[in-house]
């Protein structure tokens, strides 16, 4: 968090949002393909 002043907040928010959507998408895809049941 020391370099927060050098990194724009919207970049962090965008990256966090994409990462969250990717994780949710993987869980949904895993549940449909049967991999999510093993987690």
From Swiss-Prot:
Segments crossing the lipid bilayer: 9-29
Question: By its UniProt entry, which Gene3D superfamilies does this protein fall under?
Answer: 6.10.250.2070
Query: Cross-referenced InterPro entries, in alphabetical order?
Result: PSII_PsbJ, PSII_PsbJ_sf
Q: How does it sit in the membrane?
A: Single-pass membrane protein
Entry-linked SUPFAM superfamilies? Photosystem II reaction center protein J, PsbJ (SSF161021)
Question: What intrachain disulfides are recorded?
Answer: none
Name one process (GO BP) from the record.
photosynthesis
User: Which NCBIfam families did the record assign?
Assistant: PRK02565.1 (NF002722)
- Subunit structure and binding partners: PSII is composed of 1 copy each of membrane proteins PsbA, PsbB, PsbC, PsbD, PsbE, PsbF, PsbH, PsbI, PsbJ, PsbK, PsbL, PsbM, PsbT, PsbX, PsbY, PsbZ, Psb30/Ycf12, at least 3 peripheral proteins of the oxygen-evolving complex and a large number of cofactors. It forms dimeric complexes.
The molecule here is called Photosystem II reaction center protein J
Taxonomic source organism: Guillardia theta (Cryptophyte)
């Amino acid at each position: 968090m020391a370099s927060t002043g050098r990194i724009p907040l919207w970049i962090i928010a965008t990256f966090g949002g994409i990462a969250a959507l990717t994780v949710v998408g993987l869980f949904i895809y895993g549940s449909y393909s049967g991999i999510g049941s093993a987690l």
